Amino acid sequence: MSKINLEDLKSLSKETSAGLVHCKQALSEAHGDLTRAREILKELGHAVSVKKANRGARDGVVGALSSGKFGVILELNCETDFVARNEKFQQFAQSVLEAACAAKVKSVEECLSTPLPGGQKVRDAIVEQVAVFRENIVLSRCVTYEVSQSGLLGVYVHNKYTENLGKIGVAVAVVSEADPSFLSTVAKDIAIQVMSECPCAIDVARIPPNLLESEKHKYNLEVEGKPASVAEKIIAGKLSKFYKKVVLLEQPLFSDPERSVKQYISDKEMESSAKIDVVWYEVFVLGEAS
């Protein structure tokens, strides 16, 4: 076996994040040639990636990041909480998140093809991380949105590991001429509302038709045999309760249940002398897509 230079061993491990044992094996096989050792580690990473590709990856992190008018929310999965909490895994997830935001990707595929700061594509970097952590790693979801008008995109992360990584991520787009710093607070409040109360639509008009029809059908069955005027009032009351449960603007405000979200926004409009519209939101809960 060729004698291994300890400095090269440390350097290779730091550069690739691979374990010392694998770096030592690679350097030995490469007869001390660092360039060849890097190639061997990449080949090892690919082999391990193929081997582990069918293993379930349901842990990991959800990341959310905004550059102002553009934001990204993604989920990077691994197999265990042990790896999800690993600082190097989180640093890798953060680098993917930042690259996706900077490149304004529009899909998982675009994100996988995006280069990281060193020039390596996310897809290839994931293969290397599989070799490092010996777990299957998958970029399972990536959604982005850009505010084209005046306004911004705010994000909120719950059960945080870091500022941008956690177990739940929310992104909210608001359109307004209000001061950006003021609007940022509004967007965060709305994001917390979305995370806490899980609405299915921003307003009544955007409730999925099949869901609304299903509710109406259920209420109609419940009032069968009652006078039309009575049935109409009962259905109206039930729909009102339903809207308060599933429609963002109709929900009681999480931080102040005496007000609805709609009233909160109205108050903020008066405070800023500017109209504020919530135009989009997305929420990712770790593992829900598995």
UniProtKB/Swiss-Prot annotation:
What GO terms fall under cellular component here? cytoplasm
Q: Which domain of life is it from?
A: Bacteria
Involved in Mg(2+) ion dislocation from EF-Tu: annotated span: 80-83
**Keyword annotations for this protein?**
Cytoplasm, Elongation factor, Protein biosynthesis
Spell out the subcellular localization from the entry: Cytoplasm
InterPro entries of this UniProt entry? EF-Ts_dimer_sf (IPR036402), Transl_elong_EFTs/EF1B (IPR001816), Transl_elong_EFTs/EF1B_dimer (IPR014039), Transl_elong_Ts_CS (IPR018101), UBA-like_sf (IPR009060)
One Pfam family it belongs to: EF_TS
Q: Name one GO molecular function term.
A: translation elongation factor activity
Q: Which family does it belong to?
A: Belongs to the EF-Ts family.
HAMAP family the record matches: EF_Ts (MF_00050)
Describe its function. Associates with the EF-Tu.GDP complex and induces the exchange of GDP to GTP. It remains bound to the aminoacyl-tRNA.EF-Tu.GTP complex up to the GTP hydrolysis stage on the ribosome.
Which NCBIfam families does the UniProt record give?
A: tsf
What is the protein's name according to its record?
A: Elongation factor Ts
Organism listed in the record: Neorickettsia sennetsu (strain ATCC VR-367 / Miyayama)
User: What taxonomic ancestry is recorded?
Assistant: Bacteria, Pseudomonadati, Pseudomonadota, Alphaproteobacteria, Rickettsiales
Gene symbol here is tsf
